[in-house]
Design a protein with these regions (language model features):
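Juxtamembrane intracellular "pre-TM" segments in multi-pass secondary transporters
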Residues: 118-154, 180
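Helix-loop-helix hairpin linking two adjacent transmembrane segments in secondary transporters
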Residues: 70, 74-119
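Conserved MFS/SLC helix-loop-helix module at the cytosolic interface between two early adjacent transmembrane helices
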Residues: 1-27
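Primarily marks hydrophobic transmembrane alpha-helices of the MFS/SLC 12-helix fold
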Residues: 9, 32, 220-226
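Helix-breaking motifs and short loop linkers at transmembrane-helix boundaries and internal kinks
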Residues: 4, 25-31, 59, 243-244
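A late C-terminal transmembrane helix in Major Facilitator Superfamily
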Residues: 272-309
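Cytoplasmic helix-loop-helix junction between adjacent transmembrane helices
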Residues: 35-73
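Extracytoplasmic gate region of multi-pass secondary transporters
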Residues: 144-205, 264, 268, 299
Length: 341
């Protein structure tokens, strides 16, 4: 929110790609551990900057679709990552890390020439008078504004609650597929990853198109679209938890992915209805941090449930939290505009 977002995007991509390259030289766990920590910081710099930049370039009729198209990159990356072990088996894991890192660093250089900051933002960053400079929002002033807005607290919970099953599927779905379908992990990993990635890809595109059209007729269209996505994840989590046949489990995975994709495409557009452009990066950064913390907690919790043989029940119980978030969202989120200034 305070510096040029183009250079945050380019810099973070270069750093995490460089870290990926260096991982190929790691000799022990501690080296991987600290390199992964640096990667986490650089990745955290990226997502608020990128989504804020996209939201500024795409307003009204194309915002949700643009965010959705961007999110497809994450899902494609996850799907490709599902074959990381296969690639490593062919070329060695050292070479795999090296080349993924090299590709990322080259692409960051390409972005220097192709990525542009929004012109309106650049004008705002160059006030014509000393008085204009004084109006630049302070860090703590922005945080104070966000946390004093009740709608932001609702959005924060609305974002964090689905992050629990979202991270649960990323980290534990292969194990659940392996146990429920009685198949080896070597098969369960790619099946679960591709199932979620493909269906989420479909979900973000559908959710983006539906939201952009609905909001033209009803200002709560984005809220309703996000609610549809969350609603789809509830039966999906129940089926994932208690399903035992191939059709039930795979079908549940597809349903969850579509629902989560619809939800994912509308987070930033909904935020734009309640938070001004000056604070959107900060707001999404806080949301992303909260979601990751929730994911870390549920990953550890599901690990304990797995040891106790209750992984399926754990997935099903997560649907309760999603239902609470869904109810709060529909009752409290009543935007007055599609683009808060």
């Amino acid at each position: 929110d305070r510096v040029n977002r183009k250079w945050l995007v380019v810099g973070s991509l270069f750093v995490w790609s460089g870290v990926t390259y260096l991982m190929g030289y790691a000799d022990n766990f501690h080296e991987l551990y600290w390199l992964r920590a640096v990667m986490g910081v650089s990745e955290a710099l990226y997502i608020p900057s990128a989504l804020s930049l996209i939201a500024d370039w795409h307003q009204g009729k194309s915002r949700s679709l643009a965010i959705g198209v961007h999110m497809t990159g994450l899902y494609v990356g996850q799907a490709i990552g599902g074959f990381g072990a296969t690639v490593a088996a062919i070329f060695s894991w050292h070479t795999t890390f090296h080349w993924f890192g090299i590709v990322g660093m080259i692409y960051s250089v390409v972005l220097i020439f192709l990525l542009r900051e929004n012109p309106d933002r650049m004008i705002a960053e160059q006030p014509s008078s000393a008085a204009g400079k004084e109006k630049r929002p302070s860090l703590f002033g922005g945080l104070s504004m966000l946390f004093s807005t009740w709608a932001f607290w609702i959005i924060l919970f609305y974002f964090a609650a689905p992050s629990l099953p979202g991270w649960a599927t990323k980290n534990w779905l292969p194990t659940l597929f392996s146990e429920s379908l009685d198949i080896p992990m070597a098969e369960a990993g790619p099946i679960s990853t591709i199932t979620i990635a493909f269906s989420s890809f479909v979900g973000v595109i559908l959710g983006g198109i539906l939201s952009d059209r609905w909001v033209q007729k009803n200002i709560r269209g984005r809220v309703y679209t996000g609610a549809i996505g969350l609603g789809l994840t509830v039966p999906a989590l129940m089926l994932l938890g208690f399903g035992s046949s191939f059709v039930a489990v795979i079908g549940a995975g597809l349903l969850f992915g579509i629902g989560f994709g619809i939800f994912d495409a509308n987070n930033m557009p909904i935020l734009c209805q309640f938070v001004s452009a000056k604070h959107r990066g900060t707001a999404y950064g806080i949301m992303n941090m909260t979601g990751v913390f929730a994911g870390a907690a549920v990953t550890q919790l599901l690990g304990k449930w797995t040891d106790g043989g209750s992984l399926g029940e754990g997935f099903a119980m997560l649907s309760i939290i999603v239902l609470i978030a869904l109810a709060l969202q529909l009752y409290f989120l009543r935007p007055k505009t599609d683009n808060m200034e």
